[in-house]
Amino acid sequence: MEAITLTPAAEVINNLFFALDYQILAIYHALALACPWITPIMVGISYTAKSGIPLIIASIVMICFKKTRRTGIYCLAGLTVGAILVNVIVKPLIMRPRPYVFNADIRSWWTFVGSHTESDGSFPSGHTNAAADFSVAFCYANGKKYVPWAILYIVLMGISRNWLQVHYPSDVLFGMIFGIGAGFIAGALVSFCYRKFEERKSIKNANPEK
């Protein structure tokens, strides 16, 4: 493969994580060889957060119904904060090459599972970030009872991106970190706005115009 020129930030990340990333991706490849029937499942999981679009659609649908409107607003806010943080700021700043571009072995593993090329940088994982944005915001709106399901979805999304060899494990890890952070930030902002709205509503009801 041709030599890849790394940005200073991408070079630091590769120096820190590549050796371990490679070993973990090798394990995923071994699992894909042993259990090829899992690959279509991983593709399906991955598609639920493709460009964040399915999750954006889910949020908008929830907003359309009074019973789920509050949840939809939280989720859409989480996705928005996460997209700005990861897709607008961090990814263009780091510009870490995809693993299948950087390493010949990983490229052969990527070819084996039939993955497609991705158009943006590898660090952090946008799919995992979106899954975490959405899930944390959903839990923020609905309480702790959904936390186990949120954790399961976030973890499965990260696994799917590694299984398909389109992200390093470190990309996924930081996608989770950024996504969880964005979800909490969005949840706090939306909760603040709701409180202010309720306060104004209470004041208005207590002092109706005569």
Model-derived regions, located:
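Short helix-capping/hinge motifs at transmembrane helix termini and TM-loop junctions
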Residues: 65-66, 94-95, 164-168
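N-terminal transmembrane-helix/juxtamembrane module of multi-pass inner/ER membrane proteins
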Residues: 1-55, 87-117, 208
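Membrane-embedded catalytic cores of phosphoryl/pyrophosphoryl-handling enzymes
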Residues: 108-210
